[in-house]
Design a protein with these regions (language model features):
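An N-terminus-focused feature that recognizes amino-terminal "leader" regions
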Residues: 8-28, 40-45
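Solvent-exposed loop/turn segments at secondary-structure junctions
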Residues: 4-7, 38-41, 77-80, 107-110, ...
Length: 208
């Protein structure tokens, strides 16, 4: 289950790639894809004529196929609105299967922050070099938006580097981060930064 994206190339390189890996690991299992965002599902239908399933529709499909044990694997980064809706949908189907379990979002426990910080930095440090790093998360009005600030702290603690996390729809915006960079002891009014999404998207760089 993913939030989804309206960009076909990104969907194939990221979300679909995860689905392919799951199918390869469990070749005998019924694997359904679901998109939690209604807006994204509607856009996929209108632009690409793709009928993406909602989590409820995917569970209903599994029920009709006679599946008895279900593992729900969200690709959500934080335990925000979309992930809570997913868990509520799964609860409603508790009696439809012998067993149904929902995996945690990426950042659910304190140890997750340390593990993700290590994995992210080790994969990005050569590309980052001496440049400041900005990670862009989706963000949410949910209290789980605080997870991004906690993730920034964990990244800074592990990497010992100038790292920021901003969000598209959360409380910490890119403008907030730019203001921090300009007013901080390591002022970066000119020069480059590495800007990369903290979501299922592609890596890219940008001048700032």
């Amino acid at each position: 289950v993913s939030f989804g994206t309206t960009y076909p190339d990104t969907r194939q390189k990221n979300i679909a790639a995860i689905t392919r890996q799951v199918r390869a690991l469990y070749p005998d299992a019924v694997v359904e894809e679901a998109v939690s965002s209604t807006i994204v599902r509607n856009a996929m239908k209108k632009r690409e004529h793709i009928e993406a399933k909602s989590p409820t529709e995917a569970l209903e499909s599994m029920k009709k196929q006679g599946v008895t044990h279900v593992a729900v694997f969200p690709t959500h980064v934080i335990d925000g609105i979309e992930n809570h809706r997913l868990k509520e949908a799964a609860k409603k189907y508790a009696g439809a299967f012998e067993q149904i379990a929902v995996a945690d979002a990426l950042l659910a426990k304190p140890q997750d922050y340390e593990d993700v910080a290590k994995a992210l930095w080790e994969s990005l440090k050569e590309e980052v070099g001496d440049f400041p790093l900005i990670l862009m998360g989706h963000g949410t009005e949910h209290a789980a938006d605080a997870s991004y600030a906690m993730m920034e702290q964990s990244l800074r603690a592990y990497a010992k580097h100038e790292i920021y996390i901003a969000t598209v729809e959360g409380s910490i915006t890119i403008k907030d981060v730019i203001a921090r960079m300009k007013s901080g002891p390591q002022s970066r009014q000119n020069g480059k930064v590495l800007l990369t999404p903290f979501m299922l998207c592609l890596l890219y760089t940008s001048d700032a």
